[in-house]
A protein has these predicted regions:
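Transmembrane-helix boundary and interhelical linker motifs in polytopic inner-membrane proteins
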Residues: 6, 23-63, 82-85, 115, ...
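Membrane-interface junctions at transmembrane-helix termini in multi-pass inner-membrane proteins
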Residues: 106-134, 154
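Small-residue-rich midsections of specific transmembrane alpha-helices
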Residues: 14-42, 61-68, 104-112, 167-170, ...
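Alpha-helical transmembrane segments of multi-pass membrane proteins
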Residues: 74-77, 87-112, 129, 141, ...
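Interhelical loop/hinge segments that connect adjacent transmembrane helices in multipass membrane
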Residues: 160, 171-215, 229
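Interfacial/gating helices of multi-pass transporter permease domains
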Residues: 1-21, 153-158, 191-203, 216, ...
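Membrane-interface helix-capping segments at transmembrane helix termini in multi-pass transporters
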Residues: 5-13, 45-55, 66-103, 148-158, ...
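Membrane-interface helix-loop junctions in multi-pass transport and translocation proteins
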Residues: 2-9, 126, 137-169, 231
Length: 250
């Protein structure tokens, strides 16, 4: 991929990826909360309460999706000021296009993410992992032909976004077709909401720390040095991530 893109183009892709990774913080730990509270309600067997839970979580994610658009717009308009020393004019133009695409991706992904969490709560782990495997494999399989045809980092972001939303739409289809989930949009139980937010806060805190620790450095390199340095650093980070995964397996 680096050979086909070149250091500068790959560095731009890695830089925008690290910047937009902060969008994942907006999940607020709700994904884990959905699994926990849906699983707990399944033990009770009250479908009406489950429908209310689904409705409440979907409303929260819709709000987060709208918030994502506003944050993406702010990043877009301030991109020139942030990376004026590190990126060229053509790189800034591509970066803005990539920010728009990824912002749209996340704006749709947050509301759709509820269905993947519901699948986990219903212990349909095989189908959930199968979708994840297909999504992971589909990205390089689709991307490589486009790279050989001369497309660059913008095309990669488009492919990643389309594959991601496609996998989330499959989760939506599976939930309605096979799990038969329902949604009820009534008055929100504020006591339950407070309990859920209290639970998800610590997950949210962990995500923030993780993002600051692993993604801030690429952002700083891009702002002060340039995309080539980001590319070299991103390659080194790949080896660190491989080592981390090996540790978790052991």
């Amino acid at each position: 991929m680096i050979r086909l893109l070149g250091q500068s183009e790959y560095g731009l892709y890695a830089l925008i990826g690290s910047l937009i990774a902060y969008f994942s913080v907006l999940d607020l730990g709700l994904g884990n909360a959905i699994v926990r509270y849906t699983s707990r309600n399944r033990a009770v067997g009250d479908k009406q309460i489950e429908a209310k839970l689904n409705g409440m979580f979907l409303i929260l994610y819709l709000i987060i999706g709208i918030l994502t658009i506003f944050i993406g717009a702010i990043i877009y308009f301030y991109l020139d000021d942030i990376f004026t020393n590190g990126l060229s004019t053509s790189e800034l133009r591509k970066a803005k296009i990539m920010v728009i695409i990824i912002t749209i991706n996340f704006a749709f992904s947050f509301p759709l993410a509820i269905f993947g969490s519901i699948i986990q709560a219903y212990e349909r782990f095989v189908i959930f992992k199968l979708v994840e495997i297909v999504r992971i494999l589909a990205v390089p399989i689709i991307t490589l032909p486009f790279l050989y045809l001369g497309f660059g980092s913008v095309a990669m972001v488009v492919i990643v976004s389309v594959v991601n939303i496609g996998s989330l739409l499959f989760n939506l289809y599976y939930c309605f077709k096979y799990i038969k989930i329902k949604f009820h949009f009534g008055k929100i139980d504020l006591t339950l909401l407070k309990e859920i937010l209290g639970y998800s806060f610590f997950v949210f805190l962990g995500v923030i720390v993780d993002q600051i620790y692993w993604n801030t450095d690429q952002f700083i390199l891009g702002a002060l040095v340039g995309t080539v340095s980001v590319a070299i650093y991103a390659i080194a980070m790949q080896f660190i991530n491989m080592y981390k995964r090996k540790q978790y397996e052991e």
